[in-house]
Amino acid sequence: MKPIFVPSAGPGDWQRFLADPERHWVSGRSAKTLAHCWEGAEGFPPEVLAVLAQAPAFKNITPLFIVPEWKVPLPGGSTESQSDAWVLAKSESGLVSITVEGKVEESFDKPLGEWKTKASPGKITRLEYLADVLGLSHPIPDTIHYQLLHRTASAVIEANRFGATHAAMLVHSFSPTNQWFTEFKDFVALSAQRRLSENSAQ
């Protein structure tokens, strides 16, 4: 991916960056819904800003630039992690790297138990790398969904690359039934367990 970016003229400009522009650009689905929501906002959408503002580290946060369909290379294969958007933001405590994953009713890809079925050496390498980036113990529970791991790792990787103080993975859900929220909570709980272990060791 070239380090050259052009301004967006509207939501339609996001379509050409999709992995499958025709199949994924559908009204009522996440890619198109997210594009219209974020293009219609001045900075962060209000509901996103309300969530970010709850974290002291994100006080007075503002986006510096937002890039649709941001790709981050990962070891273990040629497929990159492609977030719906990546934001480099600034708060009172410094730069913030944020990967954004839009959802309506779509899942977070397969749970690891399915994803690891007949896993190639490349998959094993990638999973170990993601665990190391996120500071998670091996093995990661099979119920955790793969997409949550590599999207969150992407935020951390880009934070290191751009010298950001903080990293966050944001799920912007448009689901009226909070579809897949339980799976997201399980992942957050796993991250919380890591923090508790770190505090106990200090």
What kind of region is each of these model predictions?
Residues 1-77, 90-93:
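Acidic-basic catalytic patches of nuclease active cores, encompassing PD-(D/E)XK
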Residues 71-72, 103-107, 174-177:
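Short, solvent-exposed loop/turn segments at secondary-structure junctions
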Residues 82-86, 102:
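Conserved beta-strand->loop/alpha-helix structural units within folded catalytic cores of enzymes
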Residues 87-99:
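Active-site beta-strand-loop-beta-strand hairpin of nuclease catalytic cores
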Residues 108-169:
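Acidic, metal/cofactor-coordinating or nucleic-acid-engaging core segments within structured domains
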Residues 171-202:
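Short, low-complexity, polybasic intrinsically disordered segments
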